[in-house]
Amino acid sequence: MDKILEGLVSSSHPLPLKRMIVRKVVEFAEHWLDEAQCEAMFDLTTRLILEGQDPFQRQVGHQVLEAYARYHRPEFESFFNKTFVLGLLQQGYHSVDRKDVAILDYIHNGLKLIMSCPSVLDLFSLLQVEVLRMVCERPEPVLCARLSDLLTDFVQCVPKGKLSVTFCQQLVRTIGHFQCVSTQEKELREYVSQVTKVSTLLQNIWKAEPSTLLPSLQEVFASISSTDASFEPSVALASLVQHIPLQMITVLIRSLTTDPNVKDASMTQALCRMIDWLSWPLAQHVDTWVIALLKGLAAVQKFTILIDVTLLKIELVFNRLWFPLVRPGALAVLSHMLLSFQHSPEAFHVIVPHIVNLVHSFRSDGLPSSTAFLVQLTELVHCMMYHYSGFPDLYEPILEAVKDFPKPSEEKIKLILNQSAWTSQSNALASCLSRLSGKSETGKTGLINLGNTCYMNSVLQALFMATEFRRQVLSLNLNGCNSLMKKLQHLFAFLAHTQREAYAPRIFFEASRPPWFTPRSQQDCSEYLRFLLDRLHEEEKILRVQSSHKPSEGLDCAETCLQEVTSKVAVPTESPGTGDSEKTLIEKMFGGKLRTHICCLNCGSTSHKVEAFTDLSLAFCPSPSVEDLSFQDTASLPSAQDDGLMQTSVADPEEEPVVYNPATAAFVCDSVVNQRVLGSPPVEFHCAESSSVPEESAKILISKDVPQNPGGESTTSVTDLLNYFLAPEVLTGENQYYCESCASLQNAEKTMQITEEPEYLILTLLRFSYDQKYHVRRKILDNVSLPLVLELPVKRTASFSSLSQSWSVDVDFTDINENLPKKLKPSGTEEAFCPKLVPYLLSSVVVHSGVSSESGHYYSYARNITGTESSYQMCPQSESLALAPSQSCLLGVESPNTVIEQDLENKEMSQEWFLFNDSRVTFTSFQSVQKITSRFPKDTAYVLLYKKQSRANGIDSDNPASGVWANGDPPLQKELMDAITKDNKLYLQEQELNARARALQAASASCSFRPNGFDDNDPPGSCGPTGGGGGGGFNTVGRLVF
């Protein structure tokens, strides 16, 4: 019969005829056959199954073997023995390799045919050993899947006892070696199905023998924690996670995180690879285990691992959001990684450039699942932008993209952040620096945050962008000096010429830090700026003294510094008096003078004092009460003398009698340094010669320029704050003035006027007020509009007699140290004359982001003003200011500078502005500067720099001795150039080493992102270093299996 069958299958007869004859052969199996005939038939059918030329031959072999084995079971039992099966497994069958899946399929079917025979027990024992050997040989996924099918049907073949543990461990290793090289969907689905069969086998073994579970999991961790660069465990290991009981999470994570034998590098690798498991489709609970391990590492304060893993894998996790099968798990892990990474915005900024595209894509498909996902993503994004406020250039597109989705409340955001922090109060978070790459497209260099040094960085960038000041500093010949100015020159040179994206100002920080400033803690940028300018000023004065005492020692350091300051630093000024050669660089650039007048309202005597200033502190004032917004008759107010003006008593014979003409404004304000006594009655006073005042004009009118609260109809402007600053003040109540003529405390009027303007006007908005009820400093979050052009009233003081001849009436100014209620009387004369208005252009703005003075972040907006801006025409003073009421002279809304602001707005908008945010520098616009507080309520302008413009032609001439200054900075000294060249070479070497490290896939590559000079146990700050937005796309993401 075997000969007939063999000839039939190889014949050329039609297929229907062959099938009919095969059917007859199968039916003949019921007849008796001797043992030799049965063995011949079994040999033939085995050969057809394993070596059949086509599917028909293999099909015939299966049908005939099954029929003859069923009717001739003892003969088949004798044929399918241990020796035959062992030979198949170890040597194969003729031309069929032993690892061919057909061998396992044949054995699988053979076991089914002799299941009821006694000899099957011997085969089970044999297979328990052989399957372990096969698994140790790391079979391919398809063979391993067929083996899993066999062992699932015949659990008796699964190794027992100690061999069972070994078998599970080896099977885990085998899964770790699985790879799928195909990219076709059909092959990928088959691969996933094969891996699922193997993982299901392991699950069944774990259930049957629980003692095998823990060793299997240990083997999983050993595979994924391997630091061998030549081996990358397969992501197919993720298929095992869903079979691990969730009840074991706590025990396993504690064991892993506290085991001293587990090195940080191994733990980093393991965690990274577990995050890679998010790419595996159909895997459940991967996100649960990943988050549990992240929390476990945080609990034992292994923050270095968390920082490294987050920065390495945040892009991959975010990219998983594009795929529906793994999106829920990816979002859960992404949320935890971002919300717990609270010491630095670097991780969040890596994904920021890609959020808008993701949102737009999911909004366009319109699926309910996409909408629900976007709601969750929007909440996460709002939490991150709240925590890392101070990056408007990055966040504005995101806010626009998610504006239609609900925004969580501030209370909810705080709760989420508090619950997600690695520790509630951690002192072990490391300040992880940004990856340093080449300069940004702006061509500007950032400053690395050394640990809560954003207050210094923002000020230094503002000073660097003060073009005239920067050029004067760079032009100094300070070789041999070790002064603070030398260090500033070194810093400016690196900011201008380094190839690095960001520079670390460590040396300058240590030299310029005020002694009372605690390192790595939050500080006030305005306080730092004042200290810095004062240090530079006093240092130059000391050098002058040293130079004058050593005239015969040649050009030593002191003389060299003095020569450069006195000869090369020549800033044009119109103020007479002290020559420029006697001024320090700081005085020439930032120095101005204020003249204070105090008039006793009892005897009329006055005192005068002139003080130098480098900045003006502008206080806020609250909205006036409803009662104050009405006209008040002077008859209803306390009065001194109704007719006749009292002549002042001049104590100083060189000073002229002062005629006071109060402006028509009344203010009440309470600020951090200027606290006025509320409720004290306004006093009407006269300190001048008699003049006729019509009754209609003898009324007090609240100025239209009183700043409004945020809820009011108008927005406070810098001009409003200057109005308030320059308004006269009445000293009454507890703030009475001690008059030497009266020898007692008396009511008095205190005014202040600017007599000499600075080249760069620094304005500090006093945003931090002291809350007497709670004894804390609070921040004033009022929005303040910033004019591009500002006109400062300046009254020259070259000669008092000449002033009295030119101006018929003095203009009054207030003190900056005391804020008391003021009652001002309108002018009754037509001879009111305004001081000279000096135009200034906005140069830079330092912004504070935060809600208190003890926390937050500083960044700055700035632009280059080289002194060549002539895009505006000043309104002639004779036309716009002559015979104007004194109220207009105080920069009110009716003053000429308001018109200039409107004319300039569109023209100046197109000029380049830069946003300096620690190491990140980006292009921006003046529109962004104007809208910063309206878009981000915690971000408010704090320190402003205005550059003076010449009235003659709108430009300030450059130093005539330096012709190259016209279009650029002066050439650097050789010492500075050599230092920069050396550092640029070092930078190129660093880039090369980093490239090699990335190529070798070093496990500790991310550690290079942290500075060597800082301790990982230093406390974190809320204004850490930035990462520059990531960029570059998802080039590190591996191929997904879908």
Swiss-Prot record:
PANTHER family: UBIQUITIN CARBOXYL-TERMINAL HYDROLASE, UBIQUITIN CARBOXYL-TERMINAL HYDROLASE 38. Its EC number is 3.4.19.12. The gene is Usp38. Disruption phenotype: USP38-deletion mice produce higher levels of IFN-beta, TNF-alpha, and IL-6 than WT mice in response to viral infection. They are also more susceptible to inflammatory damage and death and developed more serious pulmonary fibrosis after bleomycin treatment. GO terms for biological process: negative regulation of innate immune response; negative regulation of proteasomal ubiquitin-dependent protein catabolic process; protein K33-linked deubiquitination; ubiquitin-dependent protein catabolic process. It catalyses: Thiol-dependent hydrolysis of ester, thioester, amide, peptide and isopeptide bonds formed by the C-terminal Gly of ubiquitin (a 76-residue protein attached to proteins as an intracellular targeting signal). GO terms for molecular function: cysteine-type deubiquitinase activity; protein sequestering activity. Residues 445-949 form the USP domain. It is found in: Cytoplasm; Nucleus. The active site is at residues 454, 857. The lineage of its organism: Eukaryota, Metazoa, Chordata, Craniata, Vertebrata. InterPro entries: Papain-like_cys_pep_sf, Peptidase_C19, Peptidase_C19_UCH, USP38, Usp38-like_N, USP_CS, USP_dom. This is Ubiquitin carboxyl-terminal hydrolase 38. GO terms for cellular component: cytoplasm; nucleus.
